[in-house]
Structures are given as C-alpha cells and as structure tokens.
Design a protein with these regions (language model features):
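Hydrophobic, well-structured mid-protein blocks that either form specific transmembrane helices
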Residues: 116-161
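Rossmann-fold NAD(P)-binding glycine/threonine-rich loop
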Residues: 82-94, 101-122, 133-141
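N-terminal Rossmann-like NAD(P) cofactor-binding module of classical short-chain dehydrogenase/reductase
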Residues: 75-76
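An anion/phosphate-binding loop that grips the pyrophosphate of nucleotide cofactors and donors
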Residues: 72
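C-terminal substrate-binding/catalytic lobe of Rossmann-fold NAD(P)-dependent oxidoreductases
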Residues: 5-7, 12-69, 147-268
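Short gly/pro/ser/thr-enriched loop/turn and capping motifs at secondary-structure boundaries
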Residues: 38-39, 105-108, 129-132, 160
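Short glycine-/small-residue-rich Rossmann-like dinucleotide-binding loops
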Residues: 79-80, 103, 208-210
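Nucleotide donor/acceptor-binding cores
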Residues: 2
C-alpha cells in the first residue's frame, strides 16, 4: 500500500485527489495538509472529500504540518509556489517522493525544487491529463513539420486562476520553440495591443483568457497564407488532472532521487 500525503487539501484539486487516494486499492491517505490559517485545519477529511467508499473510512484530520514521526511514501502538492517550495524541502528532509502540480513557479523556486531532487524523487508537470501531454507531443511535431507557419496559443481558465499564462500554455510554447530552434525568451509575445507592427515569423503568440468556471482549454494554431491547422484540448472536469496526479504518485513511489516528468510516467 502506497502511503500518500496531500498538500493543498482544501483546494479544488486537493479535494478531488483526497477522494481518489482514499478510493484507490493501492493507496492510503496518511495526512492532509493546509495553510495554518485555513478554517478547516483540525477538521476530519470527510469535510473535504465526500465521494469516498464506505469501506475505507479515514481518521485523518486536516493539519498545517505532518506529525514528526509520520511514515509516508509520496506527497502530492497542488497549492501555491511558496508552499510548494516548503513542501519539497519537507519531502527532502523526510525522504518522501514529491509530486508537484503547482504552476507559476519562478526560476529561483524551480532551482529549489531541483535541490530537493538531489535527495528524493521529484516529479513536476504543468498538466497531468493524458490528452494534454499528447498535445505537447503533437505541437512539437506540427511545429517541426510546418516551418514558417505563424504559431499562436490561446488558453482559457476559470476566473479564480492566479497565474497567467497557464503552465500548460508555456509548455506548449516551449515545445514549439524547441522543435523550431527558437529562443522562447526572445520570440514569445504575450498578447498584443496598441501598434505592435506586422507580425514576424519567429513570434510565438501566447494569450490568456479568464472566464467563469472553465476548467482548462488550450488551442494552438499553425497558420500560413491559405490555411490553418488547429489543435485543441479541453478538460471537462478536474478528474483528468487529479487521476493523473495519483497515477504519477503511484509510479514515483520508490524511485531514486532525481527530477521526473509526467511524460516519463506515460512513456511518451
């Protein structure tokens, strides 16, 4: 049985991951973590996860920190960058593998994740859905096969998302840039306004929409004079991401220290 800690347990993703971990025959929930100031700290996880099998009751309560002697195999974190860094440091100290689904980390924060990976297995991904990860591959292939086409990326998420553009949109741009030998730091254009002038071929446009309760939509277009190829992924619910994160945690358990990707989990 794989022992799992969930960090960011009261968040939209955290709640669903709690349910999936408790409902999986191969995993058991050993801790659920939230910010110290969160009103649900001290409450049973049943207050967060309603869809749990009756034969797998849990006595776990939401806590701001794990017990000193807690035995665990993997911690799954979907929170905010500042918390994710603390979680990675905690995992390195305790010897737990860590799955990080938080996006919006800056360069310094990514370096701290890399430091944790020198001690434990660390898996980071901008998106844990199978379909989206296939889209990463398709975009790289299309960019390679369609040199000179104008590449534009449009992502849409719910009004509550804090970072923009999404980590998935940035990964799509990275894959397109890698496939065409471009330096994304020099060719990325984040939205347009005013009089930017004519579009240049090396540009990769990245645009973010925030509206309602959209779970996640990403469209990449490759356009030249006379035609457009459009590739789109739409998430219908957070289950696509939550199931992928739990699958990644099960795969990561027992792996040696190092940095891992969800593409490795999927074998693509």
């Amino acid at each position: 049985m794989i022992r799992i800690v969930v960090s960011g347990a009261a968040g939209r993703m955290g709640r669903r991951i709690l349910e999936l971990v408790q409902g999986d025959a191969e995993t058991t929930l050993v801790a659920a973590l939230e910010a110290e100031s969160h009103p649900l700290v001290g409450q049973p996880v049943a207050a967060l996860a309603a869809d749990v099998p009756a034969d797998k009751p849990s006595d776990v309560r939401v806590a701001s920190a794990p017990d000193a002697g807690l035995a665990a195999d993997v911690i799954i974190d979907f929170s905010v960058p500042e918390q994710s860094i603390k979680v990675a440091a905690l995992a390195a100290e305790r010897g737990w593998a860590v799955v990080v689904g938080t996006t919006g980390l800056d360069a310094a924060q990514k370096q701290r994740l890399a430091a944790a990976a020198s001690k434990v297995a660390v898996l980071t991904a901008p998106n844990f859905s199978l379909g989206m990860n296939v889209l990463f591959q398709l975009v790289a292939e299309a960019a390679h096969r369609l040199p000179g086409y104008d590449i534009e990326i449009v992502e849409s998420h719910h009004r509550f998302k804090k970072d923009a553009p999404s980590g998935s949109a940035l990964r799509l741009a990275e894959r397109a840039a890698e496939a065409t030998g471009r330096d994304l730091s020099k060719t990325a254009v984040y939205g347009r306004h005013g009089l930017p002038g004519e579009r240049t071929t090396p540009e990769i446009g990245i645009h973010a929409l925030r509206r309602g309760d959209v779970v996640g939509e990403h469209t990449v277009t490759f356009t030249t004079l006379g035609e457009t190829l459009e590739l789109t992924h739409r998430a219908h619910s957070r289950d696509a991401f939550a199931r992928g994160a739990v699958h990644a945690a099960k795969w990561l358990a027992g792996k040696p220290a190092g940095q891992y990707t969800f593409e490795q989990v999927l074998g693509i």
